[in-house]
Amino acid sequence: IYTLSLHDALPISSLYYLGKVDEAKKIQQIRSAMRAYDEENVFTTHRGMILVERQIGHATRYGLMAAIDLEAYDYTRASTSWIRATEGTVAERIPPRMKIREGAPLELPHILVLVDDTEKLLIEPLVAIRDTLPVVYDFDLMMGSGHIRGYSLADGEIERRVLAAIDRLQSDETLAKKYGPLNERNRILFAIGDGNHSLATAKEIWEKNKKTWGPDHPARYAMVELENLHDAAQEFEPIHRIVLGLSGSLKNALADEFGGTVSFEPFANREALFAAVDATKDGVQSFGLIEDGEFVKVTFAEPRSALCVGSVQQFLDQLRKAGFFKEVDYLHGTEELSALSDVKGNAGIYLPPVQKNGFFEGIIKDGALPRKTFSMGEAQEKRFYIEARRIL
């Protein structure tokens, strides 16, 4: 699998070097390798969906490999499609990826798509019968990344059950129960958790060629792994902010902007502050502010976004436009956040874990979540390039 990926894919870091003299040569090598592997039967062909079991440390995460219809996907912020982006899509990142995908006979996806399945209708019933299913692959992953196993779902009755579950998730009754009175914004089924720019690339290529290819062409669809947002092993890590080069007090700027709708609670140290923010109740938006040696829990009484990170980011964007600070950096851990917050003229923003119950509501209300809202696990928990699908 490792060798196949190196020959059949271009590492994301290499995208920034496209335009150099070896660009066409490298892309041609990828296409040639794909065709050779296909013609020489390097791949084992399977039809139908696959149940994926990924063991990572103490947890086991499940997913459903399937193909989604790109006609039902729109990555723009104003999207009202059934399938939407979670974060804003950077248009400039799409053309380099199009150069690679266009003309490629295969796709090797790493795309993770989330479903807001609180009743566990779609994937969990498949997990319950996995011991009766044929195993497609079963092996350890490299560099401490755990173990992966795939089960074939190429059975007519199982496929009917999957489609019935999707129909129920799309039903007016289910949607109204989760999101309130129906409108064009809250008719949503899937949200892209990881790999949105890759999926946006597939969408653009399909839109460019669909009149020539026709509605039944395989490139109308893109293979992804569907995962339940409410899987206990699906962990969303918050991404904190460090505000650099402030021209004034961030705490005072918050008070000026929000007035009586924001409150400040001081703590003796950063550990107590972090614990208090982590313990924030569902439906309440609070974050930690570290500035000038103070440790303050900030709470919005009238939040301006569905998620706390959205309310914070909107405020920071306003201040950036006003020239109130030099830049914002995004940090995953607390050690660097703490160290940088101690520098004069900086302020650290410690964000709470993303509340799963408000995740889809954030997409519905705001169109897309703010950049750097969350991280889906550590590096060794990311999806590997394992499955391929013919698209030309």
Indicate residue ranges for each PLM-predicted region.
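Active-site beta-strand/loop microenvironment that shapes enzyme catalytic pockets
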Residues: 168-212
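A short, acidic, amphipathic alpha-helical segment used as a generic capping/interface helix at domain edges
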Residues: 165, 169-173, 271-280, 329-344
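C-terminal amphipathic alpha-helical segment
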Residues: 231-296
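N-terminal extension/subdomain marker
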Residues: 1-146, 150, 154, 176-180, ...
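Catalytic or ion-translocation cores adjacent to nucleophile or general acid/base/metal-coordination motifs
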Residues: 194-257
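A general structural signal for short secondary-structure junctions and capping/turn motifs
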Residues: 42, 53-57, 98-106, 181-184, ...
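Long, compositionally biased intrinsically disordered regions
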Residues: 1-9, 23-31, 284-392
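Glycine-rich phosphate-binding "P-loop"
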Residues: 142-165, 300, 304
